[in-house]
């Protein structure tokens, strides 16, 4: 059997730090970000289905979110201001991401490729799937800003404002529900969120 470096590469996502140009109270890596995005995307899909008549596969959405930044193990995490400095850079970076995604897919053993390719190649996402993952991605970045600001790090003030505009642009009923039900707790301390459920 031929060896594959696929999971050895993915395990290195934990070595890639997000928000590299900003001072962080707590450094966040791509691996932990991907897990949080997967959990939030799954929640958004479940909320959409249960509350707003949606019909999406919440488990698939979670998997797509888990792999949504996988190509960064080959490209690194390009800071947002650089990535979107102008449309030409954004377009070129998309092309680089596509190449990196294909390179990852090519690492998967051929007999498993049809399982992993649709998770890694974002062109295999439906518009609805892409929208839910993007909403979750933006929500998690926003939550990171809240955490940094709560720790007294005003470096994230402008990022929070920018992300509020992004969330407004991607707004949906399921996002509104998530923001109303789950996000307020991120403003509280551990003691405050533990009050109602003592161990």
From Swiss-Prot:
Top-rank EC class of the record's enzyme: hydrolase
Positions that bind substrate: 18-19, 33, 69, 77-80, 137
Catalyzed reactions per annotation: a 2'-deoxyribonucleoside 5'-phosphate + H2O = a 2'-deoxyribonucleoside + phosphate
Keyword set, alphabetical order: Cytoplasm, Hydrolase, Metal-binding, Nucleotide-binding
Location of the protein in the cell: Cytoplasm
Gene3D superfamilies noted in UniProt: Hypothetical protein af1432
Keyword Hydrolase listed: yes
Gene Ontology cellular component annotations, sorted alphabetically: cytoplasm
Statement: the UniProt record of this protein carries the keyword Nucleotide-binding: yes
Molecular function in Gene Ontology: 5'-deoxynucleotidase activity; metal ion binding; nucleotide binding
A Pfam short name: YfbR-like
Positions of a divalent metal cation binding: 33, 68-69, 137
Domain HD: 30-142
Function as written in the Swiss-Prot or TrEMBL entry: Catalyzes the strictly specific dephosphorylation of 2'-deoxyribonucleoside 5'-monophosphates.
Protein name as annotated: 5'-deoxynucleotidase YfbR
Gene name tied to this protein: yfbR
């Amino acid at each position: 059997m031929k060896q594959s470096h696929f999971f050895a590469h993915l395990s290195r996502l934990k070595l890639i730090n997000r928000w590299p140009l900003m001072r962080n109270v707590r450094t966040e890596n791509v691996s932990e970000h991907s897990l949080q995005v997967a959990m939030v995307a799954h929640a958004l899909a479940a909320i959409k289905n249960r509350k707003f008549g949606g019909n999406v596969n919440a488990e698939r959405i979670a998997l797509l979110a888990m792999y949504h930044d996988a190509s960064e193990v080959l490209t690194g995490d390009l800071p947002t201001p650089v990535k979107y400095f102008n449309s030409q850079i954004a377009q070129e970076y998309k092309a680089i991401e596509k190449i990196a995604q294909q390179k990852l897919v090519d690492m998967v053993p051929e007999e498993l490729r049809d399982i992993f390719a649709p998770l890694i190649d974002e062109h295999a996402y439906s518009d609805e799937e892409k929208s839910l993952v993007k909403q979750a991605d933006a929500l998690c970045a926003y939550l990171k800003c809240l955490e940094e600001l709560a720790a007294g790090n005003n470096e994230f003030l402008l990022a929070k404002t920018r992300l509020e505009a992004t969330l407004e642009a991607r707004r949906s009923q399921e996002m509104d529900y998530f923001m109303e039900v789950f996000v307020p707790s991120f403003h509280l301390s551990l003691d405050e969120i533990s009050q109602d459920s003592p161990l």
